[in-house]
C-alpha cells in the first residue's frame, strides 16, 4: 500500500473513531449522571443540555419503531462501507462526507441496538429544532460535505460543470 493511501485511510479511520468515541462518551456520561428530561447545563440564550431518549429518527419520525430504525441504521452503515470499497473515492470532500455519515449513523445505531432509543442532549434555544447529539452533528456535516462535493468537485459523467 502506498504511503499516500495509508495516510488517506489513517485520517479517515482516525476521524471516524474520534467521532464515535466522543459520541459514546457523552451519551454514556449523560445516561449515568442525569435523569430523562433533566437540564444539566445551559449556555444562556443559546442552548440547554438536557437528557432526552428519542425512540424515533430525525424529528422523531417513526417513533417507537425501534426494530425498523435499527435495521435501517445498520443497513445504512453497511451500505456506506460497501460504497467506499466499491467506488474507492479519492477526493477529500467525498471521503469526508462518507466518514461523517458513517460515524454519525454508527453512533446512533449503537444506541438503537443497545438501548432501543437514541440519547439526545443538545437543545438550541433560539431555533425551534429537535434535541440532537454529536452523531447527528456528524450526519448533518456529512450532508454539507456531500453537497459541496456534488456542487464543486464531482466530475462524473452527467455532472460536469
Regions found by a protein language model. Give the residues of each.
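Alpha-helical transmembrane bundles and membrane-interface segments of multipass inner-membrane proteins
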Residues: 1-161
Amino acid at each position: 500500500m502506498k504511503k499516500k493511501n495509508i495516510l488517506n485511510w489513517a485520517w479517515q479511520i482516525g476521524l471516524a473513531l474520534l467521532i464515535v468515541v466522543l459520541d459514546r462518551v457523552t451519551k454514556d456520561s449523560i445516561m449515568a449522571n442525569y435523569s430523562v428530561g433533566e437540564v444539566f447545563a445551559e449556555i444562556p440564550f443559546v442552548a440547554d443540555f438536557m437528557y432526552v431518549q428519542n425512540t424515533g429518527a430525525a424529528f422523531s419520525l417513526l417513533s417507537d419503531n425501534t426494530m425498523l430504525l435499527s435495521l435501517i441504521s445498520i443497513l445504512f452503515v453497511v451500505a456506506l462501507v460497501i460504497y467506499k470499497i466499491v467506488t474507492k473515492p479519492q477526493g477529500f470532500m467525498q471521503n469526508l462526507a462518507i466518514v461523517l455519515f458513517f460515524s454519525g449513523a454508527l453512533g446512533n445505531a449503537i444506541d438503537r441496538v443497545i438501548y432501543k432509543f437514541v440519547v439526545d442532549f443538545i437543545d438550541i434555544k433560539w431555533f425551534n429544532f429537535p434535541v440532537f447529539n454529536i452523531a447527528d452533528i456528524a450526519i448533518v456535516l456529512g450532508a454539507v460535505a456531500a453537497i459541496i462535493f456534488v456542487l464543486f468537485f464531482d466530475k462524473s459523467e452527467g455532472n460536469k460543470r
